[in-house]
UniProtKB/Swiss-Prot annotation:
<dbReference type="GO" id="GO:0016579">
    <property type="term" value="P:protein deubiquitination"/>
</dbReference>
<keyword id="KW-0862">Zinc</keyword>
<dbReference type="GO" id="GO:0005634">
    <property type="term" value="C:nucleus"/>
</dbReference>
<dbReference type="GO" id="GO:0000398">
    <property type="term" value="P:mRNA splicing, via spliceosome"/>
</dbReference>
<dbReference type="Pfam" id="PF02148">
    <property type="entry name" value="zf-UBP"/>
</dbReference>
<dbReference type="InterPro" id="IPR033809">
    <property type="entry name" value="USP39"/>
</dbReference>
<feature type="zinc finger region" description="UBP-type; degenerate">
    <location>
        <begin position="27"/>
        <end position="124"/>
    </location>
</feature>
<feature type="binding site">
    <location>
        <position position="85"/>
    </location>
    <ligand>
        <name>Zn(2+)</name>
    </ligand>
</feature>
<dbReference type="GO" id="GO:0004843">
    <property type="term" value="F:cysteine-type deubiquitinase activity"/>
</dbReference>
<protein>
    <recommendedName>
        <fullName>Pre-mRNA-splicing factor SAD1</fullName>
    </recommendedName>
</protein>
<dbReference type="InterPro" id="IPR001607">
    <property type="entry name" value="Znf_UBP"/>
</dbReference>
<feature type="binding site">
    <location>
        <position position="60"/>
    </location>
    <ligand>
        <name>Zn(2+)</name>
    </ligand>
</feature>
<dbReference type="GO" id="GO:0046540">
    <property type="term" value="C:U4/U6 x U5 tri-snRNP complex"/>
</dbReference>
<dbReference type="Pfam" id="PF00443">
    <property type="entry name" value="UCH"/>
</dbReference>
<keyword id="KW-0687">Ribonucleoprotein</keyword>
<dbReference type="InterPro" id="IPR038765">
    <property type="entry name" value="Papain-like_cys_pep_sf"/>
</dbReference>
<dbReference type="InterPro" id="IPR001394">
    <property type="entry name" value="Peptidase_C19_UCH"/>
</dbReference>
C-alpha cells in the first residue's frame, strides 16, 4: 500500500497562499480568508435552503449552506449581507463569486484553496492519476483512508446502494470510463452516477466517508426506483438496465465486461438411446448468475451457529457445468463467460411472511481463485448479509421479521489484502475467514 507522506496543507497555509495570489488585484478577495472547508458538504441535495429550488444554486463557502441566485434580493445576496459571508461557488458552473459585489473570482485555477474545493465538488482525473490507485490518502482532519475503499454514512437505510456502487466502481473498464470522461452532455442520471464513482476514488476527500442519500433520493423521485423489498441484487440489476438505457458507451462496456450467456435445454434420458434434447433450446443473456443453496431448516432457539451447514461453491456451480442425471431435466450450459462474473446466492423466499428470519443460512465455502470450464477467475468482491434484530416494544419477544444489513468486502490488488466496508468503518479481513458470513453477491474477474 503506497503511503502519501505529503499531508494536506493547513487551512492557514492555503488561505495565506490564496490571499497572496490575488489580494493585490482586488481588495475584496481578502474574504477568501473566511472560507471554511470543513463545513462544506457537496454530497447533500443541491437545493436552496430558503426556496427549496434546485435552480441556480450556490454554496456559501463560509457556512456550507446552499442558496439560490446571485442577483440583488436573491437568497444568496441577502445571506451575504446578513451574515457577512462573501465567497460562493456556483454548483453547476463551478465558478467562484464574491457577493454582494457580484464579482467573479478570476484565475481561480491558480489558487490551491479554490482548486481543492472545485475538486471536492467535481473530481477530475487523467490516465496517469489512475496508475497508482488505490493509495493511502488524508482528509482535512488528517485521518487516513484508501481511495476506492470508502465508507458511507446512513448505512441503516442505503447499505444496499453502497454495496452496488462499490461493486461497479471496482470493475476497472466501468470505473475508468467514469473517471476519465466528462458527462456534461449526458442525462442527469449518468451525470450523478459518474460523480458518485469519481468521489469514491477521490484522493482529496474533505471527510473520509461519503453520502449517497441525495443520489438514491433522486433515483426514487425522478428515475422510478420503486423496488420493495430491495436488496443489492435487485438494485444492481435495476442500475445495469438503467445505465444501458441511458448511455450507449456504457452499454457497450457493460455488455462486453459483465454480460454472460447460458443455454437452457430440456433433456430426456431414454434407456434405449443416448440422452436427447426435447422442446425448445434457448440462449439467455445474464448479468447475474443465481446459485441455488441446498434446502435449509431455520434453527430452533438454542441451536449453535457452529451447526450451520456448509457447501463448497464448486458444488453449486455443477448446475451450469454438468448435465443432470434425472430422467427428465433442464440442462444449463454456460456459452459465454464475461470478464466479471457475478454470482447471487439465493437465500430468501419472498413468499414467506418472514423472509429474513426464515432465510437460508447455509455458509458457502470458497477460495480466492476459481476455475469454470477451464477459465480461471479471481474473487474481487464479496457482499455479505447480516441480521439486525428488531427490538421489542412491549417487553415480549419480537414476532415480526428481522432486518437485513449489507457489508461489502473488496480485494486490494496492490496490498493483496481484503478490506471490509461496513457503514463508515473500513477494516482489514483475512481471506480465509470471508466465508464465515452469509455471502449474497460475489464478483469474480477473469484472469488472462
Amino acid at each position: 500500500m503506497e503511503v502519501d507522506n505529503k499531508r494536506r496543507h493547513s487551512e492557514d497555509e492555503l488561505k495565506q497562499e490564496a490571499v497572496k495570489k490575488i489580494k493585490s488585484q482586488e481588495p475584496n478577495y481578502a474574504y477568501l480568508e473566511t472560507v471554511v472547508r470543513e463545513k462544506l458538504d457537496f454530497d447533500s441535495e443541491k437545493i436552496c435552503c430558503i426556496t427549496l429550488s434546485p435552480l441556480n444554486v450556490y454554496c456559501c463557502l463560509v457556512c456550507g449552506h446552499y442558496y439560490q441566485g446571485r442577483h440583488e434580493k436573491s437568497p444568496a445576496f441577502i445571506h451575504s449581507i446578513d451574515e457577512n459571508h462573501h465567497v460562493f461557488l456556483n454548483l453547476t458552473s463551478l465558478k467562484f463569486y464574491m457577493l454582494p459585489q457580484n464579482v467573479q473570482i478570476l484565475h481561480d485555477g491558480e489558487v490551491q484553496l479554490l482548486n481543492s474545493i472545485k475538486f471536492a465538488a467535481y473530481p477530475t482525473y487523467c490516465p496517469k492519476d489512475l496508475e497508482d490507485f488505490p493509495r493511502q490518502c488524508f482528509d482535512l482532519s488528517n485521518r487516513t483512508y484508501l481511495n476506492g475503499f470508502i465508507g458511507f454514512t446512513n448505512a441503516a437505510t442505503y447499505d444496499y446502494a453502497h454495496s452496488v456502487l462499490l461493486l461497479i466502481s471496482h470493475m476497472v473498464p466501468v470505473r475508468d470510463h467514469f473517471l476519465l470522461n466528462h458527462f456534461d452532455n449526458q442525462g442527469e442520471f449518468i451525470k450523478r452516477l459518474s460523480i458518485c464513482v469519481k468521489k469514491i476514488w477521490s484522493p482529496k476527500l474533505f471527510k473520509h466517508h461519503l453520502s449517497v442519500d441525495d443520489f438514491v433520493s433522486y433515483l426514487k423521485v425522478r428515475e422510478g426506483l420503486n423496488l420493495n423489498p430491495i436488496d443489492p441484487r435487485l438494485f444492481l440489476l435495476w442500475l445495469f438496465n438503467k445505465i444501458c438505457s441511458s448511455s450507449n458507451d456504457l452499454k457497450s462496456i457493460l455488455n462486453h465486461s459483465c454480460k454472460g450467456k447460458v443455454k437452457i435445454a430440456k433433456v430426456e434420458n431414454k434407456p434405449e438411446a443416448s440422452e436427447s434434447v426435447t422442446g425448445k433450446v434457448i440462449v439467455k443473456p445474464f448479468w447475474v448468475l443465481t446459485l441455488d443453496l441446498p434446502e435449509f431448516s431455520p434453527f430452533e432457539d438454542g441451536n449453535s451457529v457452529d451447526d450451520l451447514p456448509q457447501i463448497n461453491i464448486t458444488k453449486l456451480l455443477t448446475k451450469f457445468t454438468k448435465s443432470r442425471s434425472s430422467s427428465t431435466s433442464t440442462v444449463f450450459e454456460l456459452t459465454r463467460l464475461p470478464q466479471f462474473l457475478i454470482f447471487h446466492f439465493n437465500r430468501f423466499d419472498r413468499n414467506s411472511d418472514h423472509p429474513v428470519k426464515n432465510r437460508n443460512q447455509t455458509l458457502v465455502e470458497f477460495s480466492s481463485e476459481l476455475e469454470i470450464l477451464h477459465v480461471k477467475y479471481r474473487l474481487k468482491a464479496n457482499v455479505v448479509h447480516v441480521v439486525i434484530k428488531q427490538p421489542s416494544t412491549d417487553g415480549n419477544a419480537f414476532n415480526g421479521d428481522e432486518k437485513s444489513h449489507w457489508i461489502t468486502q473488496l480485494y486490494d490488488n496492490k496490498s493483496e489484502k481484503w478490506i471490509e466496508i461496513d457503514g463508515i468503518n473500513t477494516t482489514e479481513r483475512e481471506a480465509e475467514l470471508l466465508f464465515l458470513k452469509e455471502t449474497f453477491i460475489q464478483v469474480w474477474e477473469k484472469q488472462e
